[in-house]
């Protein structure tokens, strides 16, 4: 498959679902995982899309990822619930966690959901969008257990994960305002994408094993490994630390330290503490009008008419619209890695080639 090819999202979804069915996932699990990965690519976040499949296959083959498992309730107290993800697909455990949180927010006006010991939960904005679709605000603190990739401010090596932070605010008859980013300068997955493409990452994102700044993504993909830096120096570091504590420790999970280090970079275990709020709880009748007035005010001052000011989440909306029409782009290296993973789990070559023909058409 040549570099720069674009894939039809629906056909690609069928292929990805078939890959996980081949791995042994039940139909609903395979669908939930494919839904999430394709949605990440459509939103423009290829780092959290189908390029994760080889890592998931390795994690499963190493005994870390547990297929056909579900989130288990550890403690429930009114509007709060703690869940053990049981190393299930994060796309399953987080879906179940958000569904339960939304149900509690309907009942109580507010809910707190603590999820620990889940396999990789992917793009956090997806779970925020699930809450926004129900009409709720949500705030998410996420940690990555035992796979340090990010150096603290003034640090010389990795001490914690990319620890995403996410907030969503639903709007009436419009797309939700969505803040969703890793607390590292760039997501780890973006170094994988750059590495496959053979392109550098922006300055200020990486240091090598000796602590020297670099733009070469190979330092995060090949031994000896370097480190990501936090965004905005001390500010990103402080937010990452709070995500580690609120996402990891408060959820009943673990934080990253000597005793919790993982032996495999594919054993991606996430913890997430989520606050879900019904905006009607506050009795603010002008909330939507004030939100729209602010949005119009901000967007009315572009420096360059060819570069409009975007609201939080608007870039994803635009990218989704474009990719739904033109297809999902995928570089040759990522596609080859996905095909190799499909072969590794036993997908017959004729089945793989049949999908390749459909995707190439």
UniProtKB/Swiss-Prot annotation:
Its EC number is 1.1.1.-, 1.1.1.237. It catalyses: 2-hydroxyglutarate + NADP(+) = 2-oxoglutarate + NADPH + H(+); 2-hydroxyglutarate + NAD(+) = 2-oxoglutarate + NADH + H(+); 3-phenyllactate + NADP(+) = 3-phenylpyruvate + NADPH + H(+); 3-phenyllactate + NAD(+) = 3-phenylpyruvate + NADH + H(+). Keywords: NAD, NADP, Oxidoreductase. It comes from the Bacteria. InterPro entries: Mal/L-sulf/L-lact_DH-like_ah (IPR043144), Mal/L-sulf/L-lact_DH-like_NADP (IPR043143), Mal/L-sulfo/L-lacto_DH-like_sf (IPR036111), Malate/L-lactate_DH-like (IPR003767). NAD(+) binds at residues 48, 122-124, 178-182, 234, 270, 313-316. GO terms for cellular component: cytosol. GO terms for molecular function: (R)-4-hydroxyphenyllactate dehydrogenase (NADP+) activity; hydroxyphenylpyruvate reductase activity. It holds the Pfam family Ldh_2. Catalyzes the NAD(P)H-dependent reduction of 2-oxoglutarate, phenylpyruvate and (4-hydroxyphenyl)pyruvate, leading to the respective 2-hydroxycarboxylate in vitro. Shows a preference for NADPH over NADH as a redox partner. Do not catalyze the reverse reactions. Belongs to the LDH2/MDH2 oxidoreductase family. This is Hydroxycarboxylate dehydrogenase B. It comes from Escherichia coli (strain K12).
């Amino acid at each position: 498959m040549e570099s720069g090819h674009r894939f039809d999202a629906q056909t690609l979804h069928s292929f990805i679902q078939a890959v996980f069915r081949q791995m042994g996932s039940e139909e609903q699990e395979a669908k939930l995982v494919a839904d999430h990965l394709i949605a990440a690519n459509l939103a423009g976040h290829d780092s959290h899309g189908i390029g994760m499949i080889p890592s998931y296959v390795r994690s499963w083959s190493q005994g870390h990822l547990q297929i056909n498992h579900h989130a288990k309730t550890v403690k429930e107290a009114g509007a709060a619930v703690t869940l053990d993800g049981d190393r299930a697909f994060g796309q399953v455990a987080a879906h179940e966690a958000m569904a339960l949180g939304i149900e509690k927010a309907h009942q109580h006006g507010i809910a707190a959901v603590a999820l620990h010991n889940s396999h990789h939960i992917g793009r956090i904005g997806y779970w925020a969008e699930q809450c926004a679709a129900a009409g709720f605000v949500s705030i998410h603190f996420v940690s990555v257990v035992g796979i340090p990739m990010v150096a603290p401010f003034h640090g010389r090596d990795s001490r914690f994960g990319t620890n995403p932070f996410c907030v969503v605010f639903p709007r009436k008859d419009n797309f939700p305002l969505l803040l969703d980013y890793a607390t590292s300068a760039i997501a780890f997955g973006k170094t994988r994408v750059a590495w496959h493409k053979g392109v550098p990452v922006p300055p200020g994102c990486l240091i090598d094993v000796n602590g020297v700044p670099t733009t070469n993504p190979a330092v995060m993909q090949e031994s000896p490994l370097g480190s990501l830096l936090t965004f905005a120096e001390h500010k990103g570091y402080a937010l990452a630390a709070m995500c580690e504590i609120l996402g990891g420790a408060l959820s009943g999970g673990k934080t990253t330290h000597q005793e919790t280090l993982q032996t495999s970079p594919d054993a991606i275990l996430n913890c997430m503490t989520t606050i879900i709020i019904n905006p009607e709880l506050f009795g603010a009748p002008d909330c939507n009008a004030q939100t729209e007035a602010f949005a119009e005010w901000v967007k009315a001052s572009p420096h360059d008419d060819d570069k409009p000011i975007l609201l939080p989440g608007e870039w994803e909306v635009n990218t989704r619209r474009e990719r739904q029409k033109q297809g999902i782009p995928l570089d040759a290296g990522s596609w080859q890695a996905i095909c190799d993973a499909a072969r590794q789990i036993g997908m017959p070559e004729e089945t793989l080639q049949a999908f390749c023909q459909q995707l190439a058409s």
